[in-house]
Amino acid sequence: MKTYRRQIREKILQALYTIEIRDTDIDSAAGWLLTEEILADPNAMKFFNMLLKNIKEHMEEIDRYIVKHTFNWDMSRIAIIDKNIIRMALTEILYCEDIPPKVSINEAIEIAKKFNSTDKSSKFVNGILDAIFNDLKNEGKVHKNGRGLIDQSVTKLQKVEGEGENPESAS
């Protein structure tokens, strides 16, 4: 499954781009982009279907987050590719419990570099996603489990540093 995740993200990005420039639905646009390798791998198809389903179901909510964090920008002025990369990453952050947010953000940055709609696409995508992620985390809206847990290493470090210390005896 890991082998195909970036490829699947890129195919879904292409489908999202297609629906913005043509009069078609996302299922049709995504369906013709699938490769035989993806179709033959049940785990890859599971990831594809899950990501596509969540994007479709939550696009309006995702777009509200984007609008809130793109000050002085109208959604129509944001490059189509950049906007859809952000949509996809936010969908993963909010609705894919097993994918760490940092992985979703990093994948979005790498895809932005590859598709490079503008010279500053990867920086724009990174800035918007980072701002939205920080707000979502502060609002308690990011729910992860298993490998998707956030700040796991920080929590472990705090536990180790705090062991055996008595705050009252420190004075």
Swiss-Prot record:
Gene3D superfamilies this protein is in? NusB-like
- What are the GO BP annotations of this UniProt entry? DNA-templated transcription termination; transcription antitermination
An MF annotation (GO) of this entry: RNA binding
Query: Which of UniProt's keywords are assigned here?
Result: RNA-binding, Transcription, Transcription antitermination, Transcription regulation
One GO term describing the cellular component = cytosol
Cross-referenced InterPro entries: NusB-like_sf, NusB_fam, NusB_RsmB_TIM44
PANTHER family found in the cross-reference section: ANTITERMINATION NUSB DOMAIN-CONTAINING PROTEIN, N UTILIZATION SUBSTANCE PROTEIN B-RELATED
Q: Which family does it belong to?
A: Belongs to the NusB family.
**What's its job?**
Involved in transcription antitermination. Required for transcription of ribosomal RNA (rRNA) genes. Binds specifically to the boxA antiterminator sequence of the ribosomal RNA (rrn) operons.
From the Swiss-Prot or TrEMBL record, give the protein name: Transcription antitermination protein NusB
The opening ranks of the lineage are: Bacteria, Pseudomonadati, Chlorobiota, Chlorobiia, Chlorobiales
Q: What would be the name of the gene that encodes this protein?
A: nusB
